[in-house]
Design a protein with these regions (language model features):
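Interdomain/boundary linker segments immediately adjacent to catalytic/signaling cores
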Residues: 1-33, 178-179
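Ordered hydrophobic segments in well-structured contexts
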Residues: 4, 11-14, 66, 73-75, ...
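Short alpha-helical
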Residues: 26, 83, 111
């Protein structure tokens, strides 16, 4: 009888079941740990069940990481750049219905630059930059290594023609204040 019991699901099996593949799942786990380590959040969750949000139109949004502060919630998406544009647009539209700040984390800067940045730009074009600006939408994009250094590679503020590229920002606010 004891041999007929199903074995306990290990972490790897659970992550693959919940996130489709190990790379995406373990990157979510790493992103959550980086966000916990900042000390900015009361809670950080990667629970698909706990993070599920049913939208008014009946669609479901399940952010990869949900971070709670005392008076706000932030939603983070880990992206490997494998979505078709229509699926990515759908994901962004769901997110913008629950938050004004869309946070995307990629595996590396190459994926941020060559996969996610173009997808974000196409989504912005499909919605209309002015409409997103009026809605107060801002999109943040970075790699996991830049997130660990607490910086965003790109910020799409819907005001400027191009996203703000933090990587190329050489200004130093301390020096500016002293001059």
């Amino acid at each position: 009888d004891r041999f007929l019991v199903n074995p306990v699901e290990n972490e790897y099996q659970r992550i693959v079941r919940e996130h489709g593949n190990a790379i995406h799942g373990y990157t979510i786990k790493d992103v959550a740990q980086i966000l916990k380590d900042t000390g900015r959040y009361r809670t950080v969750s990667t629970s698909r069940r706990g993070n599920t949000i049913t939208l008014p139109n009946g669609k479901v949004c399940i952010p990869d990481v949900v971070c709670c502060q005392p008076n706000s919630i932030e939603y983070y998406e880990v992206e490997c750049g494998n979505h078709h544009q229509s699926d990515f647009n759908d994901k962004c539209n769901k997110l913008k219905s629950i938050t004004q700040n869309l946070y995307f984390i990629t595996l590396n800067r190459n994926d941020a630059e060559n996969k996610l940045k173009p997808q974000i730009e196409k989504w912005i074009a499909s919605c209309g930059k002015e409409q997103l600006r009026l809605s107060g939408i801002t999109v943040y994009l970075t790699s996991i290594s830049d997130l660990a250094m607490q910086k965003w590679t790109y910020v799409f503020n819907m005001k400027d023609d191009q996203p703000i590229c933090i990587e190329n920002d050489t200004t130093n606010t301390e020096q500016e204040g002293e001059t």
